[in-house]
Amino acid sequence: MKAPSSNGVSPNPVEGERRNINSELWHACAGPLISLPPAGSLVVYFPQGHSEQVAASMQKQTDFIPSYPNLPSKLICMLHNVTLNADPETDEVYAQMTLQPVNKYDRDALLASDMGLKLNRQPNEFFCKTLTASDTSTHGGFSVPRRAAEKIFPALDFSMQPPCQELVAKDIHDNTWTFRHIYRGQPKRHLLTTGWSVFVSTKRLFAGDSVLFIRDGKAQLLLGIRRANRQQPALSSSVISSDSMHIGVLAAAAHANANNSPFTIFYNPRAAPAEFVVPLAKYTKAMYAQVSLGMRFRMIFETEECGVRRYMGTVTGISDLDPVRWKNSQWRNLQIGWDESAAGDRPSRVSVWDIEPVLTPFYICPPPFFRPRFSGQPGMPDDETDMESALKRAMPWLDNSLEMKDPSSTIFPGLSLVQWMNMQQQNGQLPSAAAQPGFFPSMLSPTAALHNNLGGTDDPSKLLSFQTPHGGISSSNLQFNKQNQQAPMSQLPQPPTTLSQQQQLQQLLHSSLNHQQQQSQSQQQQQQQQLLQQQQQLQSQQHSNNNQSQSQQQQQLLQQQQQQQLQQQHQQPLQQQTQQQQLRTQPLQSHSHPQPQQLQQHKLQQLQVPQNQLYNGQQAAQQHQSQQASTHHLQPQLVSGSMASSVITPPSSSLNQSFQQQQQQSKQLQQAHHHLGASTSQSSVIETSKSSSNLMSAPPQETQFSRQVEQQQPPGLNGQNQQTLLQQKAHQAQAQQIFQQSLLEQPHIQFQLLQRLQQQQQQQFLSPQSQLPHHQLQSQQLQQLPTLSQGHQFPSSCTNNGLSTLQPPQMLVSRPQEKQNPPVGGGVKAYSGITDGGDAPSSSTSPSTNNCQISSSGFLNRSQSGPAILIPDAAIDMSGNLVQDLYSKSDMRLKQELVGQQKSKASLTDHQLEASASGTSYGLDGGENNRQQNFLAPTFGLDGDSRNSLLGGANVDNGFVPDTLLSRGYDSQKDLQNMLSNYGGVTNDIGTEMSTSAVRTQSFGVPNVPAISNDLAVNDAGVLGGGLWPAQTQRMRTYTKVQKRGSVGRSIDVNRYRGYDELRHDLARMFGIEGQLEDPQTSDWKLVYVDHENDILLVGDDPWEEFVNCVQSIKILSSAEVQQMSLDGNFAGVPVTNQACSGGDSGNAWRGHYDDNSATSFNR
């Protein structure tokens, strides 16, 4: 051993630290989880944690530590200086820090604290090995793993026999040590012989201690020691020498806090149970994720040989660790429970900045993606899977409303922020819902949040919390629920809005409702006065026209009404074309941004008008007078005005109250007509009821109303009354247009309207002249929706394709006359109503920008479905070409029919591209040659659910498909997926499947293919299974891949094994290493697997059931491969494809990273 060199002190110009030892070696000896904050940054000092370090070092219980009432539980300090030291006797590392409490801090200090978190102080190239008994013996040497020697040590000259060299390394005190490095033995291995025994005896190393070799930035070989955690009598005198220092640390902190003076502390990372000097940025980040009972989290622990591992746990309590001396302290205020039974020496209480919150409450294998759930019929058992039932039993606070994920959310992959917050407040099972207001704060200013958080309060429940909007789940929460067979319409998802917009809108709604009730009383009085004035005018008109007989007026009125019926029947197709032309000119309402007050006023009008206008046709039919034909048009408007003053009722009671209001108002109007001396004729009532039903079935136009008024005018009515009636009819036309447009946003109004339409339909079938069938009414309601933009024009009519108004509607997909390039987000989504039971998904999203006209609500001919609704692309958060994941339950009966139809269907043509049978299909954009080409999708005759009522597709480019897809044989799901995922060098996760649980998911990543436009249509296989696209049975992987270097990979079914012993025995037999895998302690082979968190774990640590559920792939590693993983220091450094549980369609989890021919295995 050579004499130690002099230790110089050199300041660090970047961090302001004064170092006398190598920083990389210090951090390597301190541990992989230690990273000291830089000098000049802000830190949070916890005296309670400092007391724990003193108690652990002096082996003195915390009960004997005195209390300091003037010392708060935390101090915001400026870190002036950091000095890295090591004990000269034991080589234990520690740091000396100079802190000064501060009350105010500037932005530069905050930035310095934030930048300190991003600095990686651990060495890049190092090797750590735990010493064995042979390594510490006096007659032996130190065995170095092959990959560690090749990576850290200089290269050997293998031309020598035996190959050997001399190594020179420096320890943490800058002492130089010389060793002989030789490559010998059988089998041959790297050994350190000469000089090693001297090093072991001088440093007093024992079995269990660790030795580190690192190569710093100057290519110098450094040597460090990390001793095992043993009970030591006391620390060295350089850290703490007496009990007075034990008590003095708190007194020094209290004095510094009172005078804002600097004080010095010593931090021993190997002895301290947890770091008590926390960077301010780390502390603030932890405060943003406020915890609640039942929250899942991960925590990183150090393992052997400088490795780390994440353990999962659950927060079981929030309370003070020491409520007497440290009240409202955030130090170890979380009581936790670990998932694994063998917790070992893991603590039972942690601090919030020590954990990583799992941002989904169900972070359990499989990954947190639930497919849409549908509540079953009353009294019928739900066919939920075992995995989902187990999740509900384990976490009862989950309900069926937590379903679809937000694909664009990066901080909350399972749920959106508002969904999770509403779940916490709505469900009473969460005990901390009232105490903990939220899981994440609102978008607050960082500086203001820090000042409010750290300046005055110590209550963790008041730190950076935010309030969620009142009510239930927000409009951004897409809920897909089964509906009973009595309810023909499903609740449509509302367009997503931001949190601030929801709060503003709800506040305006509450204030406007009170104002609306006050105005309704005054409006009702004015309407009654207008009614009396109109009755007086009618009486005067009756006296002036007494020269005409009553019988002649009745005959003339009947003739006019019959002529009106014939004209309306002939003009019905022309009205449809007129409506479609008007639909083209309507601007896109969703692209406009009205003020919040205008929004809420428009909402109130849409809420009131539909309820007030539902039964105008029936009331008008009961209250017509034969003498004055003008009252036929006047009374519905009066009824509408009187009903407008009613208060909005909930959906459950609005129907009954509407009937009661109808009966009361009809009695009042009948009494008013008795004063006029009018008599009602039964024949006129029948005819007028027909005309009123026409008003409900077809949207009226102003010309239509003017024609009716002219035909039904009494001979003696003057011009002023005619103008008044025309104005009334115009207002009524506008009210009905608003009424039909509001159907999209008021699902309970849709329910009432459909019941009313069914009643009218029955009455029309009894009469000799029935007007329109139900499906045509729905198509007319669909035509009232606003278009996307003025450039997106729908075809004006479907009559050119042979569609009659009374034939079953077909699905027409056409291209516009001119190619439009709408902005991003200008696509069309189509949602279909739920009409029948089953387990098919209730929606079909399509990010296609093809302009398609949906002429009916559905094309499955099992039953009539609700109207298909087109909503703008802004209603659902989609980005670029990313196809939203669809998760659907598989119907075995439908699957058998799909298989049977697949055998009988013909092969693909040039215009037909089959992509998937049960997942997602892609329609490629049409080219210039077929923009004006229309094709008609046939009606499917599947005995399945009729919810998937949209065929989302477009014409296929005649030039692109045969050359690059069909001619090359891309006619299977796997080939198409590989083509899409590998095109342009973009790698995506495709086709995730699993066999060990009943949940089956699929994820398709679609890159930005230049030859394909953004017109990608996503359809459910329930629609595409029996038409132009032949069905194909989906491959499902039920085996787990096992690999071993030098051998051909095998596949096994882990479900058929009963435990680890059978698994090890069978794997050893498969790969010809019988007897070498059964005992993991003495075996040279290590059996590892990749779990659902993409971590490489040792087989046998977890319970067998958890292993079966979470294994993705298995690897048999040799001892040299395990040492290389330890050398890299990152057990989770091998990227793994996105798979769920046991294997997947997308290939081997080790492919491209660790295979027999890969030169970069484990970052080698």
Swiss-Prot record:
SUPFAM superfamilies registered for this protein in UniProt: CAD & PB1 domains (SSF54277), DNA-binding pseudobarrel domain (SSF101936)
Protein name: Auxin response factor 7
UniProt GO molecular function: DNA binding; DNA-binding transcription factor activity
DNA-binding residues (ranges): 127-229
PANTHER family registered for this protein in UniProt: AUXIN RESPONSE FACTOR 4-RELATED, AUXIN RESPONSE FACTOR 7
Classification via Gene3D superfamilies: 2.30.30.1040, DNA-binding pseudobarrel domain, Phosphatidylinositol 3-kinase Catalytic Subunit, Chain A, domain 1
Polar residues bias locations: 464-489, 637-651, 678-710, 791-808, 903-921
CC terms in the record's Gene Ontology section: nucleus
Complex and partners: Homodimers and heterodimers. Interacts with the auxin-responsive proteins IAA1 and IAA12 (BODENLOS). Interacts (via PB1 domain) with IAA17 (via PB1 domain). Interacts with IAA19. Interacts with ARF5. Binds to JMJ30. Binds to ATXR2 in the nucleus.
Disrupted-gene phenotype: The arf7-1 arf19-2 double mutant is defective in callus formation.
Family: Belongs to the ARF family.
Keywords: Activator, Auxin signaling pathway, Developmental protein, DNA-binding, Nucleus, Transcription, Transcription regulation
Start and end residues of each PB1 domain: 1037-1130
A Pfam entry, by short name: B3
Role description: Auxin response factors (ARFs) are transcriptional factors that bind specifically to the DNA sequence 5'-TGTCTC-3' found in the auxin-responsive promoter elements (AuxREs). Acts as a transcriptional activator of several tropic stimulus-induced (TSI) genes, including SAUR50. Formation of heterodimers with Aux/IAA proteins may alter their ability to modulate early auxin response genes expression. Required for differential growth responses of aerial tissues. Involved in ethylene responses. Regulates lateral root formation through direct regulation of LBD16 and/or LBD29.
Outcome when changing residue 1095 to A: Loss of oligomerization. Loss of oligomerization
InterPro entries: ARF_dom, ARF_plant, AUX/IAA_dom, B3_DNA-bd, DNA-bd_pseudobarrel_sf, PB1-like
Main localization (coarse): nucleus
Annotated compartments: Nucleus
Transcription regulation as UniProt keyword: yes
Biased composition (Low complexity): 570-635, 652-671, 711-728, 765-790, 841-851
GO BP terms: auxin-activated signaling pathway; blue light signaling pathway; callus formation; gravitropism; lateral root development; lateral root formation; leaf development; phototropism
Tissue spec: Expressed in the whole plant.
